[in-house]
Amino acid sequence: MKINLRDITQANWLDMIDLEITKEQEKFVALNSEAIAASKFYPYYINKGIYLDDMPVGFIQYYPNYDDGKPNEIFIDQLMIDTKHQGKGYGTKAISLVLDEIKQLKGINAISICYVEGHDVMRAFFERFGFSVVEQDEFDETIMELHYA
């Protein structure tokens, strides 16, 4: 069994909508339907399904950080693993694949994420990959960054 990433297309977007998070997690992550809908208005958003072989288990969205005037930075906006598949290492493998994919992009030298204050699990998760806290934004979210050459 192998984790892989797939582009979100007309053929698989409903699979992403069917993925679920716990009620508690709803305060930390947007619904996949909202993230996919937003990407239709921002063509530079990249949506990926996280699959275990051919079974959808999660979703990730990232994009060049044009909104903050940082075109050389990729912002990972959404990462979720379905409740039935959490705690199995799929998120760790998926983020490793995404980081490798992003590092291949020309002109990109940083990756950032944000998490809602109090979501210590997310902070610890990204610290394992070398991200460090850089600021607290006006929305009470903590910004973490990873810089590379």
Predicted regions span which residues?
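Active-site beta-strand termini and strand-to-loop segments that position acidic
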Residues: 52-53, 146-148
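Active-site acidic-Proline motif in GNAT/NAT acetyltransferases
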Residues: 82-84, 88, 117-118
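Residues forming the Rossmann-fold NAD(P)(H) cofactor-binding site
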Residues: 92
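Conserved GNAT acetyl-CoA-binding A-motif
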Residues: 104-114
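Conserved beta-strand-loop-alpha-helix junction that forms the acyl-donor binding cleft
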Residues: 112-123
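Conserved catalytic-core motifs of GNAT/GCN5-like acyltransferases
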Residues: 114-115, 127-145
